[in-house]
């Protein structure tokens, strides 16, 4: 007597489970990178909102604004978002700091900067890892926080990967 086989064998089920596991293992890191990049984009958006005030101050006074107040923008703790702790202006450098919680763990507490340089009668802006500007000689250098304070380059958009010495 022949009986018809109904359903799946144990081997077939194990193969399906293995395939689903492999797909999940590939998709999860890609999704985490995607969420980190989306959260970093909020920091860039908030920081870019300060560019016009900083540029205007520089063009009117010939020096970079020393802080948020002199730039004519809200205090650093008032410029925040869902993923951004603060946006600070210091010697014309706009630095956004990510929150230390409720953010992708790879970017928690990390920073990115927007800074400008005078070139051929205009002001050119750059975006990248955190930098500082020496107010006396107007030089821009990499922030001394080390790698702990830097957002990994893979989480920065391609338009925000300038080196501190870019021109």
UniProtKB/Swiss-Prot annotation:
The chain crosses the membrane at residues 8-28. It is found in: Fimbrium; Membrane. Pfam families: N_methyl (PF07963), Pilin (PF00114). The keyword Transmembrane helix applies. Residues 1-7 form a propeptide. Keywords: Cell adhesion, Disulfide bond, Fimbrium, Glycoprotein, Membrane, Methylation, Transmembrane, Transmembrane helix. Its main location: other. Glycans are attached at residue 70. InterPro entries: N_methyl_site, Pilin, Pilin-like, T4P/T2SS_Core. NCBIfam families: IV_pilin_GFxxxE (TIGR02532). Major component of the type IV pilus (T4P) that plays a role in cellular adherence, microcolony formation, resistance to neutrophil mediated killing, twitching motility as well as transformation. Mediates the attachment and the formation of bacterial microcolonies on host epithelial cells. Mechanistically, pili retractation induces host NF-kappa-B activation in infected cells, which is temporally associated with the formation of gonococcal microcolonies. The pili are polar flexible filaments of about 5.4 nanometers diameter and 2.5 micrometers average length; they consist of only a single polypeptide chain arranged in a helical configuration of five subunits per turn in the assembled pilus. This is Type IV major pilin protein PilE.
């Amino acid at each position: 007597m022949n009986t018809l086989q109904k359903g799946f064998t144990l081997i077939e089920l194990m193969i399906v489970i293995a395939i689903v596991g492999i797909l999940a293992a590939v998709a999860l890191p890609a999704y985490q990178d995607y969420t980190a990049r989306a959260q970093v984009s909020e920091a860039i958006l908030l920081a870019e909102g300060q560019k016009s005030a900083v540029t205007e101050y520089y063009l009117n006074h010939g020096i970079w604004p020393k802080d948020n107040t002199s730039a004519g923008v809200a205090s650093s703790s008032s410029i925040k978002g869902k993923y951004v702790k603060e946006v600070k202006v210091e010697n014309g450098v706009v630095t956004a700091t990510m929150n230390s919680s409720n953010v992708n763990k790879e970017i928690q507490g990390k920073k990115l900067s927007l800074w400008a340089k005078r070139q051929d009668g205009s002001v050119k802006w750059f975006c990248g890892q955190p930098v500082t500007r020496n107010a006396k000689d107007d030089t821009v250098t990499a922030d001394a926080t080390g790698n702990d304070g830097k957002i990994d380059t893979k989480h920065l958009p391609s338009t925000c990967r300038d080196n501190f010495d870019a021109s």
